[in-house]
Amino acid sequence: MLCAVYKSIRKSQTYLFIAKRDDFSSVPEPLLAQFGPPQLVSLLNITLQTKFAMAEAEKVLSAVKNNGYYLQLPPPPVNHLQEHKDWKKKRQENKNEI
C-alpha cells in the first residue's frame, strides 16, 4: 500500500501516515489542529515486511485501511533518575541476600 508520510512541525518525532498524498479528509480536525501544518517526508510502499523503528507494518496498514490514517507518536521520555534509583535498590537487595 502506498502511503504518504508527514511529520509535525509542532510535535517532535510525530508522524502521520495517510493513503493519499495531501488528502487529510479522514483525519479528525482536532488532531490536525494539534499536529500543525503537515510537512511531507516521504511516499512509502508499505508491505507486511516493511520495517519501522517505532511501529509494526501490520498496525500501520490496518489503521490506514480502517481509519484512513495512522499516527506515530514519539516514545515516552526515559526517566534516568528513576532507573538509577531502581538499579541501586535492586543492587542493595542483592547484597542483603548474600
Curated annotation (Swiss-Prot):
Residues 1-85 form the YcgL domain. Residues 75-98 are annotated as: Disordered. Pfam families: YcgL. This is YcgL domain-containing protein Ping_1076. It comes from the Bacteria.
